[in-house]
Amino acid sequence: MTSQSPSSSNTSVPSSMSKKHYDIDVRTEQIQDMVYPQAIPPIVQKSLGSRIKRKFTTREGWIGDYDYRALCMPRLPFVTKKANSSPFYGPNEDIPVFLAIIMGIQHFLAVIGGIITPTLLISGTGSNALNLDEQTRQYMISASLFVSGLMSIVQIIRLRIPKTRYFIGAGLLQITGVSFANLPASQAMVQNMYKSGVCPTEVAADGTVTYLPCPDAFGSILGTQMICAFLTIAISFLPPRIIRRLFPKIVTGIVLLVIGSSLLTTGMENWAGGTGPCMSRPTTGDYMLCPSNDAPNAQPWGGPVNFALGASVFFTTLVIELVGSVFLKNVSVVIGLLVGCVIAAGIGMFDGSSIAIAPAATFLWVKTFKLSVYGPGIIPFLFVYLDMSIECLGDLTAACDVSGIPIEGPSFEERAQGGLLADGLSGILSGLATSLGVVTFSQNNGVIAVTRCASRVAGMFTAALLILFGIFSKISAALLAIPSPLIGGMSVFLFASVATSGIRILSYLEWTRRDRVIIAASLAIALGVAVVPDWFTYVMPTVENTALQGFYDAISTVCGTGYIMAGILSIVLNLILPYEAKPDHQDDAAAPQLGGAGRVYRDEEAGQVIEVRN
């Protein structure tokens, strides 16, 4: 027997679970969007006890018919790959217990590196970091993990605002994490606060500048982000037509490309040894070696040992991508980091003393920061949340695509509205919870595409893991003890992946002359600023009026931050440049079609042919 079509007026339970792999069939898209209990039509609802009994006492409930071999077997290079024959599990489908655990762990490992990296970098050492003590940094990492898990639950379950047509959350397997977009604006803001004397410094006799801890600067970042998060909330209520006009693919691709490219500088500096005082390679003092002279097996900045450590992470990641199984490929960055940690421990560079003295558990608000709003940071952080809105829309589009949900029409627009609203609220709630702003992550979409499991049950398991890791502070201490070269080797791969996502989005364009002009103009200024950060530093005058000077500092920060300039130029040019009557084929008539509408390629991981449509 087979079940009726989802569009049918009646719904029946399939007699063969191995054939349909459903616990229930749902009748309409509207029913699917409800929270789990309401997603089950009354005619097939079973008692809670019978569902629990079936889930935990049968092979179907524990194991199911998923192709675990395809998930775990390594893929040899240059050998034809067999497509994953596992069933596809949609967002609202129940999945076996073991599969939920495996998928939850896989999604967790795919995002953990991206979640902790911004917090590690902004709390670290240097002129554009907070230079905080180990205990405070441990707490900040714990808070970022806890908040990421909590806000992931909001995105996954999708709640309707009572008596309205609006939602909070996308209702998809979307894990949230600390956005990389926070990093450039936060670093610029902290750097300005050190320059202006808001944050303390100490100058040695030889002229070496030591940047002292500045926890109040983090409070200013949190307060400023909370105010600016209302921009994303406002965008979530805009008509879909306006959102599509403001944030087309060309804007999204340019911004992501510039974010990833500009962050590579920080990643490479950490690969060489860190961003602290040792970076200037002083010949005297406490920082001739990195991170300091008294660190275990300290090395000079840019030395061969640091280079080799970072390379061990980077190239292990590439080797796993070459020969690893689907599971290992999805967690390749974490495996590379673990290999690097083993090598660092073997040569005596891994200091575990901070792990020993760290408390067993922590919670939000164990440490607090004085909230304030930093005037010169408002304009840059408005663009941070504008970019987060762009990121969110791109991630939700990809999530719907890999989850078997249409990426156009009322259903998608409702999910986009709910996802944007949840991200905006996350900016406020994460600030109150002492964490940088979180946004939907794109890594999960890749995991869904190759595992064919988009069930929200797996997402809930991932969120629970994030919350647990945030509570157990020994884990945060272990993450903090990782030497800077290993963080650098991992982060350059993550940052380049962000840039690659932007390139992929741009490849969908038709590349008309108009497109090329917008991209060229945006990248000219944005990448130029990334290469020469002081390009605009001395343009604005210095005045005694504090308020006016704050305004000038805000302009300098905006013009000195590459991805903000990319966003401004791409949005403005996209709105004012006229569309062409015909695509410009004069320069490219004989060239093969490398991207844009009509491009067809084969996705080897998914085992299917995909056509890119305009």
Which role fits each region the language model picked out?
Residues K82, A100, G377:
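Catalytic phosphate/metal-binding cores of nucleic-acid and nucleotide-processing enzymes, i.e., regions
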Residues V97, S123-G169, P380-R456:
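Membrane-embedded helical hairpins/re-entrant loop segments and their flanking transmembrane helices
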Residues C72-S85, D584-N614:
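Non-transmembrane, juxtamembrane loop and terminal tail segments
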Residues P14, H21-L71, T125, L130-I141, ...:
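Flexible hinge motifs at transmembrane-helix junctions and intramembrane kinks/re-entrant loops
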Residues R241-K249, N444-T462, F472-F495, L506-V517:
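Transmembrane helix-loop boundary segments of multi-pass membrane transporters
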Residues P87, D94, F98-A308, K474, ...:
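Early transmembrane hairpin of solute transport permeases
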Residues Q106-H107, V147-I156, P184-M189, C228-S236, ...:
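Hydrophobic core segments of alpha-helical transmembrane domains in multi-pass membrane transport
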Residues T117-T125, A181-Q191, L396-S403, G437-V450, ...:
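Re-entrant/interfacial helical elements at transmembrane boundaries that shape
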